From Swiss-Prot:
Keywords: Cleavage on pair of basic residues, Coiled coil, Disulfide bond, Fusion of virus membrane with host cell membrane, Fusion of virus membrane with host membrane, Glycoprotein, Host cell membrane, Host membrane, Membrane, Signal, Transmembrane, Transmembrane helix, Viral envelope protein, Viral penetration into host cytoplasm, Virion, Virus entry into host cell. It is a single-pass type I membrane protein; Single-pass membrane protein. Residues 514-551 are cytoplasmic. This is Fusion glycoprotein F0. Class I viral fusion protein. Under the current model, the protein has at least 3 conformational states: pre-fusion native state, pre-hairpin intermediate state, and post-fusion hairpin state. During viral and plasma cell membrane fusion, the heptad repeat (HR) regions assume a trimer-of-hairpins structure, positioning the fusion peptide in close proximity to the C-terminal region of the ectodomain. The formation of this structure appears to drive apposition and subsequent fusion of viral and plasma cell membranes. The chain crosses the membrane at residues 493-513. Residues 24-492 are extracellular. It is found in: Virion membrane; Host cell membrane. Glycans are attached at residues 65, 69, 77, 90, 431, 461. It comes from Human parainfluenza 2 virus (strain Greer).
Length: 551
């Protein structure tokens, strides 16, 4: 397996339904609610060589008697040219910018071309390289286009100078051959023109739908196989079966989505489109099986439980591995993967899948568990201890023994089954052996975190109760703190106001004292001045005699 890593794993459906295998004890697993839904074979595929399809967008009409003027064909030609002009210009720009001689210059030209187009993804760079290679073989492509221009076959093989096989598909030529050629000489020109116009209009509508992304986006947008199917019509299966050789049938290859196309060239002269298709090569690995498992709930001592098994397993050489296929493309008949996702499984699961039911691990289910029944291959599997299982034909209620995990109902037991509000038509007979010697009473019940809802709910309830208690305590302390803070704030404000009041009063008293002192000084000065005015002689004598000793 180590040298298969460049390949891609593809799982192709070989069997469907309940089919037993060597390593897995399918019949015994049914008793505990494990159902094998599909068994697939393992295949590898790698990229194959490129193939080319030439699509002719205009039909070849037989020459008329010279009196008919088919105007609808000219109108279709003009409309189609307008429709494809952006795509033609886009391809021409890529080819022109990237047309250099050396490999290094060519790669640089691709980058320049992508920059000019405003795109830069890895997929588009790869697509641009393909267009460059096609442009290098422009002469061969033109010869190929010219060689198919005169043919009326819907599918024809053309081999160019490099021996590249291309399939020329003229998608509407069959319609023209069947509807026009036989009656071109007998009906009126107007009728032929109208008929041709209606066919061309329908096909033009399909072309508009197919190339919408290419018209509104760069030409490097890939075509899906659905677009190719619409474009090529009924000729596509013929093309695939004759040219795209694989180990898969046409329907399987188309549904896998692995077949995609890309427009690499358009001939404006002939209105032909060259599409490149890469087809993978498939190799089957003998003896390998990939099995899908469905696990429904089962009854254990009147309690609903579910067994722990992988959703998909790989059986090879009598060994079992887990195979999730998370990165795979799933179709109704295949699962295609880029790598092998096989991984070991626990010993208990291995023994359980081998039929040792006492090694199986179950987890309890509390609440509404939806996987209580499964309908596979015309037989109904249900946990009738957790569901109301009522048969409508013949009318009766299906009872399930306490020691049984599930009930298996086939057409012998009931032809129309009612599960709660669901109605099922039973169409098949259950052929497997139902093992009755295993009792769910002795089952190994283990509480696992992924499905142990009861413990999870209890843990959540405890956490919620603890959170509520903490919130209550927090609110109490917050209220206490709020009250204490309010009292402290009021006391502080009162103290500050008191201090401010005392300061203001002190300042007022000091101001009053100073004012009174100034008033006394002013009065004393005024009295002295009055005495001086009233006794001038006294002051004159005093000054001469210096009675007060003032110099």
């Amino acid at each position: 397996m180590h040298h298969l890593h460049p390949m891609i794993v593809c799982i192709f459906v070989m069997y469907t339904g309940i089919v037993g295998s060597d390593a897995i004890a399918g019949d015994q697993l049914l008793n505990i609610g494990v159902i094998q839904s599909k068994i697939r074979s393992l295949m590898y595929y790698t990229d194959g060589g490129a193939s080319f399809i030439v699509v002719k967008l205009l039909p070849n009409l037989p020459p008329s008697n010279g009196t008919c003027n088919i105007t609808s064909l000219d109108a279709y030609n003009v409309t189609l040219f307008k429709l494809l002009t952006p795509l033609i210009e886009n391809l021409s720009k890529i080819s022109t910018v990237t047309d250099t001689k050396t490999r290094q210059k060519r790669f640089a030209g691709v980058v320049v071309g992508l920059a000019a187009l405003g795109v830069a993804t890895a997929a588009q760079i790869t697509a641009a390289v393909a267009i460059v290679k096609a442009n290098a073989n422009a002469a061969a492509i033109n010869n190929l286009a010219s060689s198919i221009q005169s043919t009326n076959k819907a599918v024809s093989d053309v081999i160019d100078a490099s021996r590249t096989i291309a399939t020329a598909v003229q998608a509407i030529q069959d319609h023209i051959n069947g509807a026009i050629v036989n009656g071109i000489t007998s009906a009126s020109c107007r009728a032929h023109d109208a008929l041709i116009g209606s066919i061309l209009n329908l096909y033009l509508t399909e072309l508009t739908t197919i190339f919408h992304n290419q018209i509104t986006n760069p030409a490097l947008t890939p075509l899906s196989i659905q677009a190719l199917r619409i474009l090529l019509g009924s000729t596509l299966p013929i093309v695939i079966e004759s040219k795209l050789n694989t180990n898969l049938n046409t329907a399987e290859l188309l549904s896998s989505g692995l077949l995609t196309g890309q427009i690499i060239s358009i001939s404006p002269m002939y209105m032909q489109m060259l599409i490149q298709i890469n087809v993978p090569t498939f190799i089957m690995q003998p003896g390998a099986k990939v099995i899908d498992l469905i696990a429904i709930s089962a009854n254990h001592k009147l309690q609903e439980v579910v067994v722990q098994v992988p959703n998909r397993i790989l059986e090879y050489a009598n060994e079992l591995q887990n195979y999730p296929a998370n990165d795979c493309v799933v179709t109704p008949n295949s699962v295609c993967c880029r790598y092998n996702e096989g991984s070991p499984i626990p010993e208990s699961q291995y023994q359980c899948l081998r039929g040792n039911l006492n090694s199986c691990t179950f987890t309890p289910i509390i609440g509404n568990f939806l996987k209580r029944f499964a309908f596979a291959n015309g037989v109904l599997y249900a946990n009738c201890k957790s569901l109301l299982c009522r048969c409508a034909d013949p009318p009766h209620v299906v009872s399930q023994d306490d020691t049984q995990g599930i009930s298996i109902i086939d057409i012998k037991r009931c032809s129309e089954m009612m599960l709660d509000t669901f109605s099922f038509r039973i169409t098949s007979t259950f052929n497997a052996t139902y093992v009755t010697d295993f009792s769910m009473i002795n089952a190994n019940i283990v509480h696992l975190s992924p499905l142990d809802l009861s413990n999870q709910i209890n843990s959540i309830n405890k956490s919620l109760k603890s959170a509520e208690d903490w919130i209550a305590d927090s609110n109490f302390f917050a209220n206490q703190a709020r009250t204490a803070k309010t009292l402290y704030s009021l006391s502080a404000i009162a103290l500050i106001l008191s201090v401010i009041t005392l300061v203001v009063v002190g300042l007022l008293i000091a101001y009053i004292i100073k004012l009174v002192s100034q008033i006394h000084q002013f009065r004393s000065l005024a009295a002295t001045t009055m005495f001086h005015r009233e006794n001038p002689a006294f002051f004159s004598k005093n000054n001469h005699g210096n009675i007060y000793g003032i110099s």
